[in-house]
Amino acid sequence: IVLLMVVTSNADRICTGITSSNSPHVVKTATQGEVNVTGVIPLTTTPTKSHFANLKGTQTRGKLCPNCLNCTDLDVALGRPKCMGTIPSAKASILHEVKPVTSGCFPIMHDRTKIRQLPNLLRGYENIRLSARNVINAETAPGGPYIVGTSGSCPNVTNGKGFFATMAWAVPKNKNKTARNPLTVEVPYICTKGEDQITVWGFHSDNEIQMVTLYGDSKPQKFTSSANGVTTHYVSQIGGFPNQTEDEGLQQSGRIVVDYMVQKPGKTGTIVYQRGVLLPQKVWCASGRSKVIKGSLPLIGEADCLHEKYGGLNKSKPYYTGEHAKAIGNCPIWVKTPLKLANGTKYRPPAKLLKERGFFGAIAG
């Protein structure tokens, strides 16, 4: 209960308020330090960890292809035969695979390129689609004619031999026609809506016996890609690979190195190669921007805010304390210490004498 006394006289004196009990509220002020007040409104909350959710008012993408069962996002990005599907549009995306890997196709040397980043690159776009046609006719590319190779490690939907939809394994029909001199193929821009074109390519290498059998050359091969001002060079490794399977596939003595290049609208890319090249086929056409945040699946319900440390948050207060991390959506602002808004008077103990002050003195106080 607050008792407010107002005494009116010729001097216009005003008395301060007093409470009938001790005040439990303390606020820190810029000029007076800690001050007891009769009431406060908390402005901060300390969240607890929760599951990630769909962001309210926008489409949120979890897996790149929700309907592609038993597929990692890298499987989808490379076009593994059994992982072909539609990627939904989204304004927000969850980075749920810290180290994405393929789960059932040809063994990839992940650490030699930036291929692990490909799913994250795609997540950063609002709209993503795979081109309907191939960017290059692999059978008649320079150095050909080629046979487009397949592998039992990449079974297609009918369980026959297959390969990634984004690449063609170019095996020369005449294996004795070695590519001693580098060959160059231009990669045209084929997206139709002014999107960024993400072109996937790579190369295959194996032990000396397999290299001679497939390509008629056991020497290390050289490869270069160039697009949008970025040039990358590789030299293949010959042999030294233990037999490896991925997801109960066939054992393979060889490895593939996979990379990608981003082509802006109307810009042509180039690939310089020798034997064992994986020529680009279907390309990703991507546009718009999607905000990306590290998180986990499944997405349950909706939330105002997605926070890397706390998951889905609903904004009950304008500020929060606790762990500071990246957040997207309608999020509270991080502060180091709790904030309070005083909505009462400055507390005066009842036993103290009320000090009368002039009108302007009361305002200044």
Curated annotation (Swiss-Prot):
Protein purpose: Binds to sialic acid-containing receptors on the cell surface, bringing about the attachment of the virus particle to the cell. Plays a major role in the determination of host range restriction and virulence. Class I viral fusion protein. Responsible for penetration of the virus into the cell cytoplasm by mediating the fusion of the membrane of the endocytosed virus particle with the endosomal membrane. Low pH in endosomes induce an irreversible conformational change in HA2, releasing the fusion hydrophobic peptide. Several trimers are required to form a competent fusion pore.
Gene Ontology annotations for the cellular component aspect, listed alphabetically: host cell plasma membrane; membrane; viral envelope; virion membrane
Post-translational modification: In natural infection, inactive HA is matured into HA1 and HA2 outside the cell by one or more trypsin-like, arginine-specific endoprotease secreted by the bronchial epithelial cells. One identified protease that may be involved in this process is secreted in lungs by club cells.
Gene, per the UniProt record: HA
Major site of localization recorded for this protein: virion
Sugar-bearing residue positions: N36, N70, N156, N176, N243, N314, N343
Signal peptide: 1-11
UniProtKB keywords: Disulfide bond, Fusion of virus membrane with host endosomal membrane, Fusion of virus membrane with host membrane, Glycoprotein, Hemagglutinin, Host cell membrane, Host membrane, Host-virus interaction, Lipoprotein, Membrane, Palmitate, Signal, Transmembrane, Viral attachment to host cell, Viral envelope protein, Viral penetration into host cytoplasm, Virion, Virus entry into host cell
Membrane topology value: Single-pass type I membrane protein
Claim: Ligase is one of the keywords in the record: no
Keyword Transmembrane set for record: yes
Quaternary organization: Homotrimer of disulfide-linked HA1-HA2.
Organism name: Influenza B virus (strain B/Singapore/1964)
GO biological process: fusion of virus membrane with host endosome membrane; fusion of virus membrane with host plasma membrane; symbiont entry into host cell; virion attachment to host cell
Miscellaneous: Major glycoprotein, comprises over 80% of the envelope proteins present in virus particle. The extent of infection into host organism is determined by HA. Influenza viruses bud from the apical surface of polarized epithelial cells (e.g. bronchial epithelial cells) into lumen of lungs and are therefore usually pneumotropic. The reason is that HA is cleaved by tryptase clara which is restricted to lungs. However, HAs of H5 and H7 pantropic avian viruses subtypes can be cleaved by furin and subtilisin-type enzymes, allowing the virus to grow in other organs than lungs.
Family designation: Belongs to the influenza viruses hemagglutinin family.
GO molecular function, a single term: host cell surface receptor binding
Location of the protein in the cell: Virion membrane; Host apical cell membrane
Name used for this protein in its record: Hemagglutinin
